[in-house]
Amino acid sequence: MPVLMPSADVPTIDISPLFGTDPDAKAHVARQINEACRGSGFFYASHHGIDVRRLQDVVNEFHRTMTDQEKHDLAIHAYNENNSHVRNGYYMARPGRKTVESWCYLNPSFGEDHPMIKAGTPMHEVNVWPDEERHPDFRSFGEQYYREVFRLSKVLLLRGFALALGKPEEFFENEVTEEDTLSCRSLMIRYPYLDPYPEAAIKTGPDGTRLSFEDHLDVSMITVLFQTEVQNLQVETVDGWQSLPTSGENFLINCGTYLGYLTNDYFPAPNHRVKYVNAERLSLPFFLHAGQNSVMKPFHPEDTGDRKLNPAVTYGEYLQEGFHALIAKNVQT
């Protein structure tokens, strides 16, 4: 069962000290992260150094210029049986039934010579990109942005979350590397404005709220989200479902299920959902993951030796099972 969060307060935290060397300033950020993760489970990261205006411009141009044929040719196996990819590719809208569409790409380090690719390891794929002539510089931007947001996420996780959990800054260092991370960037989740909007594409929550995507927990270590400034997210709290504020400048951060598992729910993954809003908007999440063979020993910061802790598991196995469970619950996105 998901943990019901105590509040829906979402603080904005200046994370710039995490890039520096002042231990007191870092400790101050860590205390704020701790409070946020044990409050609503969400916080906004400001002073992150990423050009979100250009990000939106590139994403909007991509959607404007993609043809239906291109989308189908690049679609993952769930939408195009001729494509073996299950992660990297296009996730198509289905007229009258599903309006959201997205493009997902994975670690640019996964080339044909990568050991996991050679071994045919599940969840590892070499990215296929849209045609360069039709979408000039799209791939170069995507790969550059992936590395920027990965490094931002790693700083948040390594220096922020580790300190917030009472661990040394380098606690996660060897488990999350740019060469092997399973992290994915669903760069382009697009929610369209439609008139009329198909009723079959709208879901209804148990409380009667109309939804675009039902309640779920993110299968990740942490999620780093930028979205356009249209209110849509809700978190499940002890007082029921409550709306989260928006920001047109900052990244929304929350713990995924693995950090909840690793900390025995000291930092739980917040249960959240997407309200139905008939408005053109973008949702651009980065899901930070460890590597396939990473194994971390679960702990609890307040454990005195009498607490039953989760067993250690291989990250790749954990992620694959988590994805299958998410799709089974919420259907293919």
Swiss-Prot record:
Pathway: Antibiotic biosynthesis; penicillin G biosynthesis; penicillin G from L-alpha-aminoadipate and L-cysteine and L-valine: step 2/3. It holds the Pfam family DIOX_N. Keywords: Antibiotic biosynthesis, Iron, Metal-binding, Oxidoreductase, Vitamin C. N-[(5S)-5-amino-5-carboxypentanoyl]-L-cysteinyl-D-valine binds at residues 87, 91, 191, 216, 218, 283. One of its GO terms (biological process) is antibiotic biosynthetic process. Residues 180-290 form the Fe2OG dioxygenase domain. Its cofactor is Fe cation; L-ascorbate. 2-oxoglutarate binds at residue 281. Isopenicillin N binds at residues 87, 91, 191, 283. It catalyses: N-[(5S)-5-amino-5-carboxypentanoyl]-L-cysteinyl-D-valine + O2 = isopenicillin N + 2 H2O. The keyword Oxidoreductase applies. Its EC number is 1.21.3.1. One of its GO terms (molecular function) is isopenicillin-N synthase activity. PANTHER family: 2-OXOGLUTARATE (2OG) AND FE(II)-DEPENDENT OXYGENASE SUPERFAMILY PROTEIN-RELATED. Belongs to the iron/ascorbate-dependent oxidoreductase family. This is Isopenicillin N synthase. The lineage of its organism: Bacteria, Bacillati, Actinomycetota, Actinomycetes, Kitasatosporales.
